């Protein structure tokens, strides 16, 4: 039996209406509902909701910065740097430096000196710290706040608008389902106070979290969410469920989404699939628009650079590490923060765009003829396949191991995968194996000397 005091907690859900209460009970107590393990809520009072609406309206009217290296900085950057220099211990003394000479910061600095990066003047009574995985970098706790969680909504709306979608869910509707697929994850129901208390559910599609195997499809069909968000692992699981419901859009975050899987999802659900480039430290950075050939930046107050190993901004079209300044989280102002991801940045008639986006440090792989190949060549070779995830490793003897997570049987897929890699690497020995890790894995690794260049 649901603990209604917890479900309707005025601390978590201030101002909850009668129709909001009814929707929460429907989400949680439906006969096919999963085992919800937690309680959560927006924690926004009336004044904070109006402030959020004002912020969101301002963002909707502003474009992302149209700035490239060597051009005059946007007007807001100078004051932002000054506030960081005077109010954030980690940035003390930086106000007098030209922007191009500001040192870069990285995930290691946040992992080891997090308190020094939180502004001294901000209240800490409602501070939230989210833990992030360390499988692709240093384990990290990200300081946040209920208003920050609310502001993700505004930037997702900006992304949806690029595909002609304006969310319509309202009273009695389920606006979004956040779908995971893990042995165990945080699951709850809530409402969106900025969209007439439409419903939100964070669910785990792992079969062990449901009473019966068929309940997953039955529950999603009954809730009929306007949007479904997940990562390629959980979205691929949706393909196996036989859903009748068709959301207006799917949002993919957290991991790289292959072009093949996106095409299969779009065909199955007859809706766009948004491939979001998003980080826990920054929030949604950009969204891929395939017709434009790259990722379109989303945040009006996030300056994006592409830099070399020494932290120097690179000219348009040159490939380097993505560095960001600004963001919408006041509790974690970022000043030339190295994301660990790589791309080039160009100006198009539609504005700035990130092209060739790849996560984490580049890795080179050696072919049978001794030539080196960038990992982006591997990404392109794998793009036609509807893979949930893949990871490529080169052993010390130069042989390759490709591990894949796919809903197509591996024996039927292996020959085509091997042929796709052989087109780049020649007759290098290639082993194909299943990828069964429950969490994120590093996509590209090598035991060969010279495969990776340290910063």
Task: Describe each region flagged by the PLM.
Residues 150, 154, 176-233:
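AMP-binding/adenylate-forming
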Residues 228, 328-425:
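AMP-binding/adenylate-forming catalytic core of the ANL superfamily
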Residues 195, 245-247, 291-295:
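Short, hinge-like loop/turn segments at secondary-structure boundaries
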Residues 261-347, 361-363:
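Conserved AMP-binding/adenylate-forming
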Residues 225-262, 275-281:
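Adenylate-forming
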Residues 84, 132-135, 175, 228, ...:
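Conserved S/T- and glycine-rich ATP-binding loop of Class I adenylate-forming
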Residues 1-131, 138-169, 227-229, 249, ...:
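Nucleotide 5′-phosphate-binding alpha/beta core
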């Amino acid at each position: 039996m649901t603990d209604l005091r917890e479900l309707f907690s005025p601390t978590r859900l201030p101002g909850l209406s009668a129709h909001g209460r009814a929707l929460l009970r429907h989400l949680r107590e439906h006969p096919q509902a999963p085992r919800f393990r937690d309680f959560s809520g927006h924690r926004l009072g009336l004044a904070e909701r109006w402030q959020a609406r004002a912020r969101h309206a301002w963002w909707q009217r502003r474009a992302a910065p149209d700035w490239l290296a060597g051009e005059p900085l946007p007007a807001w950057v100078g004051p932002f740097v000054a506030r960081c220099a005077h109010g954030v211990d980690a940035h003390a003394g930086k106000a007098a430096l030209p922007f191009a000479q500001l040192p870069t910061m990285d995930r290691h600095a946040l992992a080891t000196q997090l308190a020094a990066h939180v502004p001294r003047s901000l209240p800490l009574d409602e501070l939230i710290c989210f833990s992030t995985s360390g499988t692709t970098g240093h384990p990290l706790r990200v300081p946040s706040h209920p208003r920050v969680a609310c502001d993700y909504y505004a930037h997702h709306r900006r992304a949806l608008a690029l595909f002609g979608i304006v969310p319509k869910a309202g009273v009695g509707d389920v606006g979004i389902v956040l779908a995971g697929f893990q042995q165990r994850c945080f699951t709850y129901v809530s409402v969106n106070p900025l969209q007439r208390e439409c419903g939100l559910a964070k669910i785990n599609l792992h079969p062990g979290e449901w009473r019966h195997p068929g309940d997953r499809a039955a529950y999603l069909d009954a809730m009929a969410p306007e949007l479904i968000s997940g990562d390629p692992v959980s979205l691929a699981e949706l393909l196996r469920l036989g859903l009748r419901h068709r959301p207006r859009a799917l949002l993919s975050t957290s991991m790289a989404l292959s072009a093949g899987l996106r095409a299969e999802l779009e065909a199955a659900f007859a809706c766009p699939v948004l491939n979001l480039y998003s980080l826990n430290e920054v929030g949604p950075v950009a969204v891929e628009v395939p017709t434009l050939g790259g990722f379109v930046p989303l945040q009006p107050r996030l300056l994006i650079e592409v830099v070399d190993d020494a932290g120097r901004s690179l000219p348009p079209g040159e490939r380097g590490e993505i560095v960001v300044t600004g963001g919408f989280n006041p509790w974690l102002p970022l000043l030339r923060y190295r994301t660990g991801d790589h791309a080039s940045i160009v100006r198009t008639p539609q504005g700035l765009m990130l092209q060739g986006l790849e996560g984490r440090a580049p890795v080179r792989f050696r072919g049978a003829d001794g030539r080196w190949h960038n990992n982006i060549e591997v990404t392109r070779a794998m793009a036609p396949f509807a893979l949930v995830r893949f990871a490529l490793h080169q052993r010390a003897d130069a042989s390759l191991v490709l591990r894949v997570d796919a809903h197509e049987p591996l024996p039927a897929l292996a020959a085509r995968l091997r042929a796709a890699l052989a087109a780049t690497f020649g007759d290098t020995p290639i082993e194909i194996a299943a990828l069964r890790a429950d969490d994120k894995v590093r996509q590209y690794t090598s035991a060969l000397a010279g495969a990776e260049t340290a910063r």
